Amino acid sequence: MVRAMTAPGSNIAAGALAPAKSSAWRTELIETLWLAWPMALTQLGQIAMMTTDLALIGRLGDAAVAAAALAHFVLFSTFTMGLGLVSAVTPLAAQAFGARAPRQVRASLRVGLWAGVIAGVPLTLGQLYGEELLVALGQNPATSRLAGDYLDGLAWSLVPGWLFIALRGLMGAVNRPEPALWIMLTAIPINLGLAYVLIHGSFGLPRLEIFGAGLATSIVSWAMCIAAAVVCVTMRPFRKYQVFGELFRFDGELMRRLLQLGLPISGASVLEYGVFGAAALLMGKFGTTALAAHQIALQVAAIMFMVPMGISVAATVRVGHAVGRGDPPSARRAGFAAIGLGFVFMAAMTLLVALTRHQIPQLFLGDSDTSIETATLTAALLIVGASFFIADGLQVVANGALRGRNDTKVPLLFAVLGFWVIGFPFCWVLGFHTDLGPFGVWIGLAVGLVVYAALLVWRFHRLTRDAMAAAVAA
């Protein structure tokens, strides 16, 4: 069902002067949940696609799994660089939707698509030299060669992946995120079947092994991108925006706004990805058991993290709508409703993980003596990670709320402070200069994330409080 837009500027003064009623908060929570659930399931679908790929690659042997890990490191490092550019479509389009400006909704998508293509073409070509890069970084030449084969197929998923995110952002911005979920759910079994056929060679096709897995992902990524484009052109809720109208018209001012929003998002994502990569390197110094336990515990965190990611995008949309129509009280309410939802979900998941910490590692491990040792350490890390999980959920939702207000530069500075000025030094000191060992690394990550999350929530509180005061004064 398509929601009607609220008239811009309605009841602003009344809303600013009076406290939010319980019915307004209840409505906001319902609206946020309605937006968030398909977005969260779409994020989980991406994890499912990666998991099925790794399961199929695992049948090729340990060397292939190691190569896939290296290839994913190269690809995701690059993917994160451009992620902010296409993610900026969501707040720009949401604000235009709230302001009842359909031409600006279309223009927001247009600049996002162009940014994805312009950044994606050279970065895709760079992926084709993944083997040389990994060898230069000191990785095993044989494993690097296999990783290069995988990247030769996988690299072509970069551009369609970004374009799909931009199109998905438009869908969410106009309150219709469901088509992106249906596309993702359809893509998962198709990717599984195509990857199996191309890896092992069936139906008369050659056996391509690890290259086939990467190629399947790229083919499915392009299919998802095309499907999203078709949906945006043909489905009634999107037709009025004529999303590909004036596709080749360059809007320098809007591109500047997208870069101002998107580059700091990319920067913060790179800083976050980097600190977790650095933590993995530190864990590797404690041996393979510690590194394996770290990876399993992080995989659990990554799965839980997808739901706050969906809530975060919903926060961007809801706050963006309120900003677009000039309604500071609703913007504040939307952000804190989303932050509350993120906290409740992650607190519940943290409790569940704590209660099942001994069973979770068995889903990833066998019954050997080494596996038992890894499982024991993983269970201990999951207990240490209790504050880590909650803070991680809070920071991503608060970030989403701030993006709805076009606030991304100061959060980038907070990321520098939280991850690298505080978090990583704590990881190093507690891990290697105390008796905590691997637990010290995780405590350091938790400290950095708690600081980062607290700063983001505080900033959203301050900005929205000041905006409401300004509305009253006006």
Curated annotation (Swiss-Prot):
Coiled-coil ranges (or none): none
Annotated family: Belongs to the multi antimicrobial extrusion (MATE) (TC 2.A.66.1) family.
Role description: Multidrug efflux pump.
The organism of origin for this protein: Rhodopseudomonas palustris (strain ATCC BAA-98 / CGA009)
Regions crossing the membrane: 33-50, 65-87, 108-130, 150-172, 179-201, 211-233, 258-280, 295-317, 334-356, 376-398, 410-432, 436-458
InterPro entries assigned: MATE_fam, MATE_MdtK, MdtK-like
GO molecular function terms listed in the Swiss-Prot or TrEMBL record: antiporter activity; xenobiotic transmembrane transporter activity
Membrane topology of the entry: Multi-pass membrane protein
UniProt keyword Kinase, yes or no: no
Name of the protein described by the UniProt record: Probable multidrug resistance protein NorM
Cellular component GO terms held in the UniProt record: plasma membrane
Single GO BP term: monoatomic ion transport
CDD domains associated with the record: MATE_NorM_like
Localization: Cell inner membrane
Pfam families: MatE (PF01554)
Primary residence: membrane
Keyword line: Antiport, Cell inner membrane, Cell membrane, Ion transport, Membrane, Transmembrane, Transmembrane helix, Transport
